[in-house]
């Protein structure tokens, strides 16, 4: 199988590339022109990132990786998104996995930052679909990332793939993002939208940030601690992508979350046990709001009790279905 990936140097993209290569598949890394396709000191941006995180770069098995330059600003212009040689690498590919997007929690949400979050998701996805339309023998499947932020702050409501969207910034962002991906259906492509929960990984994503106060013995719940957290391990997230790539009967929305969401207070207690630290120092909601503003409301205090209904219907078997075993597994990763 030949799979084209955007966002290949991110947390999920790196792990997915590694997984596909181990099984002998070909990965085409779609790199925006001038955004890291060149090597520095013999390493790509993804390889440098992994070294900084204490990880080795993905090792090739029988598979291989090809890097292709892409100009994501040609949708309404006469220019070509790919050079002639790069275009050949994408023609005939089986699928595209769209994981591009600036970090949601990387910086506070100024208006400029919000614009970047939108452009790195909705705009890039629009340009991707437009570029695919220009191919003569393009991929037949688009697997595009989204997030459970789609649902907004919903208290104790049980959220399935059929639940209507919320109306805060993250919900609107996810709706815009997904709307651009759905346009690929007009090209005859099978489109799968993956709404990821909090991805647990030792060397990236939210977990290392969550662990910081615990390392200093001051960890605890956030706000009331009653808000629901829907999570998934990186291992399961990658396996879900692999399965929807291979199962051509799957299309539409899939919630990529474990079957047992937990309240924030319970998550804090489980994390404290996993790292052998107390979890008795709550972070008051007012302090979080003063420090982080809207981002605190949407990322730390919002409640999203999401269920993986589609995955359960498909018979997916989670490697780590409960939080305690998931944290134990994740924190012992090399």
Predicted regions and their residues:
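Mid/C-terminal beta-alpha module of Rossmann-like enzyme folds, strongest
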Residues: 2, 244-294, 328-334
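N-terminal Rossmann NAD(P)H-binding glycine-rich loop of SDR-like oxidoreductase domains
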Residues: 3-23
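NAD(P)H-binding glycine-rich loop region in Rossmannoid oxidoreductase-like domains
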Residues: 63, 67-127
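Conserved Rossmann-fold NAD(P)-dependent oxidoreductase catalytic core, especially the SDR/UDP-sugar
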Residues: 114, 126-168
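Conserved beta-loop-beta element that borders a ligand/cofactor-binding pocket
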Residues: 146, 179-202
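Glycine-rich "substrate-gating" loop/helix at the edge of Rossmann-like oxidoreductase active sites
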Residues: 165-170, 197-204, 224-234
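Alpha-helical substrate-binding/gating segment
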Residues: 211-219, 227-262
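C-terminal amphipathic/interface module of NAD(P)-dependent oxidoreductases
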Residues: 298-334
């Amino acid at each position: 199988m030949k799979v084209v990936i955007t966002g290949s140097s991110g947390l999920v993209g790196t792990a997915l590339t590694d997984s596909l290569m181990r099984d002998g598949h070909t990965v085409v890394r779609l790199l925006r022109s001038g955004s890291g396709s060149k090597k520095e000191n013999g390493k790509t941006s993804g390889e440098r990132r992994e070294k900084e995180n204490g990880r080795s770069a993905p090792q090739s098995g029988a598979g291989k990786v090809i890097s292709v330059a892409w100009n994501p600003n040609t949708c309404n212009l006469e220019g070509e998104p790919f050079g002639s040689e790069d275009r050949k690498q994408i023609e005939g590919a089986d699928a595209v996995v769209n994981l591009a997007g600036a970090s949601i929690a990387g910086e506070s949400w100024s208006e400029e930052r919000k614009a970047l979050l939108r452009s790195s998701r909705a705009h890039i996805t629009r340009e991707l679909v437009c570029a695919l339309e220009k191919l003569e023998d393009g991929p037949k499947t688009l697997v595009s990332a989204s997030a459970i932020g789609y649902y907004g702050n919903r208290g104790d409501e049980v959220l399935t793939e059929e639940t209507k969207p919320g109306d805060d910034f993250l919900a609107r962002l996810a709706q815009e993002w997904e709307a651009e991906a759905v346009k690929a259906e007009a090209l005859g492509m099978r489109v799968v939208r993956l709404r990821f929960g909090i991805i647990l990984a030792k060397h990236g994503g939210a977990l290392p940030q969550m662990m910081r106060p615990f390392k200093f013995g001051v960890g605890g719940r956030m706000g009331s601690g009653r808000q629901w957290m829907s999570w998934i391990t990186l291992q399961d997230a990658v396996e879900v992508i692999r399965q929807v790539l291979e199962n051509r009967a799957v299309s539409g929305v899939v919630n990529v979350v474990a079957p047992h969401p937990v309240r924030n207070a319970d998550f804090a207690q489980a994390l404290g046990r996993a790292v052998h630290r107390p979890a008795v120092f709550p972070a008051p909601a007012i302090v979080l709001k003063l420090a982080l503003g809207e981002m605190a409301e949407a990322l730390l205090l919002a409640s999203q009790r999401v269920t993986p209904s589609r995955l359960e219907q498909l018979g997916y078997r989670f490697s780590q279905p409960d939080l305690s075993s998931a944290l134990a597994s994740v924190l012992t990763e090399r």
